[in-house]
Design a protein with these regions (language model features):
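Hydrophobic, well-ordered beta-alpha structural blocks that scaffold small-molecule cofactor pockets
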Residues: 1-76, 85-86
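Active-site regions of enzymes building and remodeling cell-envelope glycoconjugates
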Residues: 57-65, 101, 130-134, 161
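NAD(P)-cofactor binding segment of oxidoreductase domains
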Residues: 76-116, 150, 154
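Conserved Rossmann-fold NAD(P)-dependent oxidoreductase catalytic core, especially the SDR/UDP-sugar
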Residues: 101-143
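Catalytic helix-loop patch of NAD(P)-dependent Rossmann-fold dehydrogenases
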Residues: 128-172
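NAD(P)-dependent short-chain dehydrogenase/reductase
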Residues: 166-197
Length: 197
């Protein structure tokens, strides 16, 4: 077996521990980390040096890196056995180069065995208030939704891969709305009560 595909059993005991990498460890990522069972080691990719102390205080190992700087992602290859990707795509364009950079960095070594990507229900487009189900075809309406569809397609393609990518379970969550409790303007319920957008 090539050295870049070393199974967990061939590693020293301290490296055999299951490891979860959260990419985009803001409010939701930190909530996910609090729900992770104890034997799993939680790491988080952060581009903010100021955020490192906050993450450490919660028992999360911070890793400095930036999805807009592919060179800073090189060390992520082979690091995690599981991954949760919650980082948003860039605010402009029709594709998601951040997810592409992350996927390319992981191609260098053994991939996480499972991966969860936080997408958006916006990939369904304007459904005019109708119910949406996950088997419904995507019909992105905005550039933001197109960027999310691009990331989903890339993740699915990589999940069906061979070699270091073989056997990766990729799950996509199409989240209808995420609102931190301390978000400017309040929660959706508070904004409805106030009559503000």
């Amino acid at each position: 077996m090539p050295s870049n595909q070393t199974p967990l059993g061939a590693l020293p005991a301290r490296f055999r521990r299951q490891r979860l990498l959260i990419v985009g460890c803001g409010d939701v990522g930190q909530r996910v980390a609090r729900l992770v069972p104890a034997p799993l080691r939680v790491m988080a990719l952060t581009s903010s040096p100021e955020n490192c102390a906050v993450l450490r205080a919660q028992g999360i190992l911070p890793l400095q890196g930036n999805l807009d700087n592919a060179q800073s992602l090189r060390r992520l290859a082979g690091l995690a056995t599981r991954m949760v990707h919650l980082a948003p795509p860039p605010t402009e364009g029709w594709s998601d180069p951040r997810t592409l950079a992350l996927l390319r960095s992981l191609d260098r070594r053994a991939w996480p065995r499972s991966w969860v990507y936080g997408s958006t229900s916006g990939v369904y487009g304007d459904c005019h208030g109708a119910w949406v189900h996950e088997s419904q075809p995507v019909t992105p309406f905005t550039p933001r939704a197109y960027r999310r569809v691009d990331a989903e397609k890339r993740l699915r393609w990589h999940g069906k891969g061979t070699g270091v990518r073989q056997g990766v379970r990729a799950s996509i969550l199409r989240i209808p709305g995420i609102y931190a409790l301390d978000r400017y303007g309040g929660t959706p319920q508070e904004r409805l009560r106030k009559g503000t957008p």
